[in-house]
Each structure stands twice: as C-alpha cells, then as structure tokens.
C-alpha cells in the first residue's frame, strides 16, 4: 500500500499531537479533574486520583516525545496505551441502561478506536 507524502504525514501527526495536547490541558482544569476522578470512583477504579494523574502523565509524556522526536515511537505507544485504558474505563457502553448515554459512549469508543488507528499509522513513520 502506498502512503502519502511526508508533508501529509507531518500534518497528520501535528493534528494528533494537537488533539492530545488540548485534551490533556483541558483535563488540568479543576472542574475536569474533579469530574474525571469522581466518575472513575463511581466506576470502581482503584485509587482513581492516582490513575487519573498517571493517565495524564502518559499523555504529556507521549506528546513531549512526539514533539521532540526523541523516542517518538515510545511516545505513540504511550498515547495508544492511555487511549485504550481510558476507553476501557469510561466507555463500557454495554453496561449503561440509559439509551442516550449508551449511544454516546459507543460513539466515543468508536472515535477512540479511530484515533488509535491514526496512532498506529503514525507509528510506522516515527520508527
């Protein structure tokens, strides 16, 4: 399979990094931090505050490695791990009774699957 130019790959990688940067910075707001930790506690995640901060550290670490190009492949893997883990925690749509919440959660899981797909494509270029 032939892939696009280096410019397209760079643009795609930049959009992925921008997405994660915006999400991570948003998670640092007091309200978002509180909501995420409370939701994890409701979902019976052990030590939810610690899990939250580890997840955020993985995101910022992955972003930094991609931006600097130093072990960028490890950075992509950190973002994949963080995304899959967050999806497993927050988007268990099959357990939800409310039809609207179930539909939204299913879509979010599918969005995250697509993002992981983009990260896997990016991984081949940063190795």
Regions found by a protein language model. Name each.
Residues 38-42:
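Short amphipathic alpha-helical coupling elements at transmembrane boundaries
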